[in-house]
């Protein structure tokens, strides 16, 4: 028993927190956590189902447990690593997990790590009464021979080809800050920062070739470096708290799982030479990250296209843009990082630069913010903005069934999702010559 307990501590030590979520009971009798509705995949799927029944609506009402930062909170059941719902209990009360820890191989440990939940006790696990095999049963995917792997070089793929900007997401995507499909936006990356052996996820970016990630200047230069040094990037990520394969239930039945997470070391970071990190206008807020090795091309990892034109000059009618990510950004005033554990996305309206300027709040000295053509704006709708994406992540436009990285998340109002106060993004098209001249073979 002592040996098992040693493994429990080793497996869960990195996951425990000094403050745990409020425990609750779901309408169907499962132990759960009271969390923002945006963080509960199971209930969001019901909420966004236009064909939900009266029984579904009653279940949603009965699941409410208060509010979190003015957002409705719900009693959310936990999910084990294989995607099954379970009870969030102390690990010693879960016979199946204790049995796995008697044989602590990599598969069993990944299952346990992926099943950690925030219960009323620190060492809590999502325990299922009839678990699936730890060899996760997945919804079969068509076998693909990726011809595009040969184009995963340092140079961004030709946007006229088929090797950038395409995802293979199954099913309808949900907008409004809700979970994205497990295989959508496969170019999204999470940047790992390290300080004193502590790893932090502070910024995002977009893979634009086999060797380069596009991100914000403030993610690779300035105050953020006092917090940590960018060391590695995560590719093919979905749930940042799960070190193993991420799995979700699919409507057709079964479970859809990602490939194993890929981490690649950072060879060097390259902020734009004219970026001034402490200037309030955040001009030239763009940077590149060169990776130590070539990224693979898979269903879950592939580059986004660079913009084919400056869409801010003659915007298309009903010009809708998308941001996606884990909502990660560092709040320098108090040093906290706000984030979601799963990939989110939201659709935002384009806002003309002059309208955006007029709606930005003046600085403390009364000075108005003046934007230039290297910046663009989107958002300004209640509860919907780039807080659902990542600092440094891409602002995307879907054109001819391909996504282009037209912007980079730069800055916005202190409080996310305020009406008539759009977020400000770096206009990537303005920097195409710099990107092309900076990339090395």
From Swiss-Prot:
It comes from the Eukaryota. Residues 174-440 form the Peptidase S1 domain. Keywords: Calcium, Disulfide bond, Glycoprotein, Hydrolase, Metal-binding, Protease, Pyrrolidone carboxylic acid, Serine protease, Signal, Zymogen. Residues 1-21 form the signal peptide. The record marks 173-174 as: Cleavage. It is an enzyme of class 3 (hydrolase). The keyword Glycoprotein applies. Residues 23-76, 77-127 form the Clip domain. Ca(2+) binds at residues 237, 239, 242, 246. Optimum temperature is 0-25 degrees Celsius. Gene3D superfamilies: 3.30.1640.30, Trypsin-like serine proteases (2.40.10.10). GO terms for molecular function: endopeptidase activity; metal ion binding; peptidase activity; serine-type endopeptidase activity. InterPro entries: CLIP, CLIP_sf, Peptidase_S1_PA, Peptidase_S1_PA_chymotrypsin, Peptidase_S1A, Ser/Thr_Proteases_Immune/Dev, Trypsin_dom, TRYPSIN_HIS. Stabilized by calcium. Inhibited by di-isopropyl phosphorofluoridate (DFP), phenylmethanesulfonylfluoride (PMSF), p-nitrophenyl-p'-guanidinobenzonate (p-NPGB), p-chloromercuribenzoate (PCMB), ethylenediaminetetraacetic acid (EDTA), urea and CI-13c. The active site is at 218 (charge relay system), 285 (charge relay system), 391 (charge relay system). One of its GO terms (biological process) is protein processing. Pfam families: CLIP, Trypsin. Proteolytically cleaved for activation. Cleavage produces a light chain and a catalytic heavy chain which remains covalently associated probably through an interchain disulfide bond. Optimum pH is 6.0-8.5. Belongs to the peptidase S1 family. CLIP subfamily. PANTHER family: TRYPTASE-RELATED (PTHR24256). Endopeptidase with selective post-Arg cleavage site. Activates prophenoloxidase. Has a probable role in the melanization process as part of the innate immune response. The clip domain consists of 35-55 residues which are 'knitted' together usually by 3 conserved disulfide bonds forming a clip-like compact structure. This is Phenoloxidase-activating enzyme. It comes from Bombyx mori (Silk moth).
């Amino acid at each position: 028993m002592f040996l098992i307990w040693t493994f429990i501590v080793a497996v869960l030590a990195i996951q425990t927190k000094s403050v745990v979520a409020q425990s609750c009971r779901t309408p169907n009798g499962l132990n759960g956590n009271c969390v923002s509705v945006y963080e509960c995949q199971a209930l969001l799927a019901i909420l966004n189902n236009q064909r939900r029944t009266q029984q579904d609506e009653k279940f949603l009402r009965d699941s409410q447990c208060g509010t979190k930062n003015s957002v409705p909170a719900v009693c959310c059941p936990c999910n084990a690593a294989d995607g099954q719902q379970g009870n969030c209990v102390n690990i010693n009360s879960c016979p199946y997990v204790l049995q796995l820890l008697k044989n602590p191989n990599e598969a069993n440990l990944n299952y346990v790590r992926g099943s950690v939940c925030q219960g009323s006790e620190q060492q809590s696990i999502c325990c299922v009464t009839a678990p699936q095999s730890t060899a996760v049963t997945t919804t079969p995917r068509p076998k693909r021979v990726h011809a595009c792997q040969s184009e995963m070089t340092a140079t961004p793929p030709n946007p006229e080809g088929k090797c950038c900007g395409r995802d293979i997401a199954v099913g309808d995507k949900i907008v409004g800050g809700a979970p994205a499909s497990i295989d959508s936006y496969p170019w999204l990356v999470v940047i790992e920062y390290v300080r004193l052996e502590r790893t932090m996820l502070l910024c995002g970016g977009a893979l634009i070739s086999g060797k380069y990630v596009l991100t914000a200047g403030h993610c690779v230069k300035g105050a953020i470096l006092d917090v940590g040094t960018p060391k590695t990037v995560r590719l093919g990520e979905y749930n940042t708290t799960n070190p193993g394969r991420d799995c979700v239930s699919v409507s057709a039945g079964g479970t859809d799982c990602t490939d194993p997470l890929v981490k690649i070391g950072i060879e060097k970071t390259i902020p734009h030479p004219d970026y001034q990190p402490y200037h309030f206008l955040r001009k030239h807020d763009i940077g590149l990250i060169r990776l130590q090795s070539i990224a693979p091309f898979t269903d879950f990892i592939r580059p986004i296209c660079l913009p084919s034109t400056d869409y801010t000059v003659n915007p298309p009618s009903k010009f809708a843009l998308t941001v996606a990510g884990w909502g990660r950004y560092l709040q320098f005033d108090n040093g906290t990082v706000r984030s979601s554990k799963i990939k989110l996305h939201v659709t935002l309206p384009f806002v003309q630069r002059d309208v955006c300027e007029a709606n930005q709040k003046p600085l403390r000295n009364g000075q108005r913010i003046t934007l230039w053509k290297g910046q663009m704006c989107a958002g300004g709708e209640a509860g919907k903005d780039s807080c659902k994406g990542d600092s440094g992540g891409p602002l995307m436009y879907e054109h001819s069934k391909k996504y282009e990285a037209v912007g980079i998340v730069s800055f916005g109002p202190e409080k996310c999702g305020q009406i008539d106060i759009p977020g400000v993004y770096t206009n990537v098209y303005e920097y195409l010559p710099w990107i092309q001249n900076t990339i090395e073979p």
